[in-house]
């Protein structure tokens, strides 16, 4: 009697509740303040921070700490507990790890989402791949072997590639990028890219030149494998590299935290000119010294004196405050350079210097005149 009726009513209520929950599941379990699907070009804009340090702390961790190896800048600071350990090839692990963390974290989460959204096709995917390659060739130059070809979406860990494997994989991926950008360049400005592109405003022809210049840079980096490097260098130049000032790439974002890091940290005593570059430029009496550096006030006979990398004395900023600083003549809103056309010219000159007798001649040297 009544028990059966109650049982059936209860069962019906459960069924109705289950149906109701199922019907409204998306409504109840979706965050209304979070977009359900982020556009691929928006994801790409998040990756773009690897081209130029978006805040001064990144400039410290990446540009300043590693710059001693280029012979351009020395970071005589107490960041490393009183010693500039990068210059001793004995960087503290937490500072070394910062390079990995900042670069990998800015690349891979969005890169994998773009791969999925674009099905590995089109300009936005090509730009994501180009940005990944730009970041990873920098990592490989700093660290040697890196995880690259085996980095997959969803994996917590990835095996390291040895250097030949990583660099060849990057070249292969870059060739695919260049092919996509070359086709896209014939169609004019890409509007999806233009919406997020603070460098070239969606101009795929400029990005193609950028990609070829990156390829030329990478070829010079692997010049120890002579035949392979020469072939890649000549392919890059034939494909078209940066040639004019208008081709140079800058991050034009000047609001918020995206500011010129060197313009900020040079005023803190955190960086000084490196002795390598000032010594060369003094030797050649290079007229550009006054545009690059401030004059020293430490009592030396030369006007421009840099701080040596790997000094046996633990650096203290006050020890070097009167050495030549970087000449930053503008404020922190100056667009940050990413790649100059001048780099392509110097790379071509280096390519000619290293080229074998069977070179096709496309690398064309440049003339350098330092004046009297």
Language model feature labels by segment:
Residues 1-19:
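Sec-dependent bacterial lipoprotein signal peptides
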Residues 7, 12, 28-33, 177, ...:
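A generic signature of intrinsically disordered, low-complexity regions enriched in glycine/proline
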Residues 17-20, 54, 184, 356:
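Hydrophobic alpha-helical elements and their junctions with loops/disorder across both membrane
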Residues 21-75, 102, 113, 117:
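Membrane-proximal, proline-rich intrinsically disordered regions
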Residues 38-41, 75-372:
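Structured, solvent-exposed acidic/aromatic patches
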